[in-house]
A protein has these predicted regions:
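Extracytosolic ligand-binding ectodomains
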Residues: 1-322
Length: 322
């Protein structure tokens, strides 16, 4: 029997919550007999359940929770690259390609993902000689009105605003920046993926926005083209973003490991966890997927993966030339 016939995906919506809803969703999955945990999508919710999956010794494989604390336990591995790597890579790209020298930053101080990238970016920016002229924060309780943050960046002459945040808040910042007559360059990370798909957002404001992402839907390789075609057919012609691609790679990686480790459904979740940990860190294991080739994992749960720099052009991603 083919491996896909032996995999049963069960979903619970935790509503991007970093508290009780995330824990309740995890407990519901566990009560339904979960043997492998492919989750969560966001960092805050992942941090809410990592100790529970460790206590249960269930293998946890997160597609896109990128904080280093997510993989503090030995049962959790990331498909995405870590926040420090994104922050460092962003500062390096901006400095090495002379994109700008005077930088403003707007980040979510209440979010581990955003704060982690910001802290790494700040450290590397200093090492690269970039000037952070404005460092502005907001929290989960104040994420709709960005007029003060935008005004500070504008008044201090920011040539580029770095946005280590998610696309929902980025769309508001772009809209409010236009209304304030502020038109700097904007640069973000994988959280900006999906910016052009937000309902009721003037996507023309996203033109020229730069970001680092492991996946670009307009890539010409056959695997990406096949995935995009199938995804659009399944989801009302919606273009997949890196969140979808990371999750897809996650399922394929697990399938490969299940085969190589000879894992069967009658094994306990704990036994499966031990086999998956051994398999994914084995010297001879690697994976070529949508979000990178030759992917390998260390015992700390980190994946070796390099982000791609892209710019939004005509509503699509285009590779940024180095």
């Amino acid at each position: 029997m083919c491996i896909r016939d032996r995999l049963k995906l069960v979903f619970e919506d935790y509503e991007a919550d970093s508290g009780d809803k995330a824990v309740n969703a995890y407990n519901t999955l566990k009560d339904q007999g979960m043997q492998i945990f492919l989750g969560t999508v966001t960092t805050g919710s992942c941090l809410a359940v990592v100790d529970k999956s460790k206590q249960d010794n269930i293998f946890q494989f997160t597609p896109s929770a990128s904080a280093q604390d997510v993989i503090a336990n030995d049962n959790c591995f990331q498909i995405c690259f870590t926040d420090p790597n994104q922050g460092k890579a962003s500062a390096d790209y901006i400095a090495d390609n002379k994109v700008a020298t005077k930088i403003g930053v707007i980040y979510d101080s209440s979010d581990a993902y955003s704060s982690g990238i910001y802290n790494a970016f700040k450290t590397e920016a200093a090492a690269k000689g970039l000037e952070l002229v404005s460092e502005q924060s907001f929290t989960k309780d104040s994420k709709t009105d960005f007029s003060a943050q935008i005004a500070d960046c504008k008044n201090k002459g920011a040539e580029l605003v770095f946005l280590p945040i998610y696309h929902q808040q980025a769309s508001l910042i772009l809209t409010q920046s236009k209304n304030a007559g502020f038109a700097p360059k904007f640069f973000g990370c994988d959280g900006l993926d999906g910016l052009t798909s937000i309902k009721n957002f003037d996507t023309s404001l996203a033109e020229g926005v730069m970001l680092l992402t492991p996946f670009a839907a307009d890539s010409k390789d056959q695997a990406t083209q096949d995935f995009v075609k199938a995804y659009k057919a399944a989801y009302n012609d919606e273009t997949p973003n890196q969140f979808a691609a990371d999750a897809y790679d996650g399922v394929k990686i697990l399938a490969k490991l299940i085969e190589s480790q000879k894992i069967t459904g009658d094994m306990s979740a704990s036994d499966i966890c031990e086999k998956l940990k051994a398999g994914i860190t084995a010297a001879d294991f690697s994976y070529d997927g949508l979000t990178g080739t030759g992917l390998k994992w260390n015992a700390n749960g980190e994946v070796s993966k390099s982000p791609k720099a892209v710019v939004i052009k005509d509503g699509n991603y285009a590779a940024l030339d180095n």
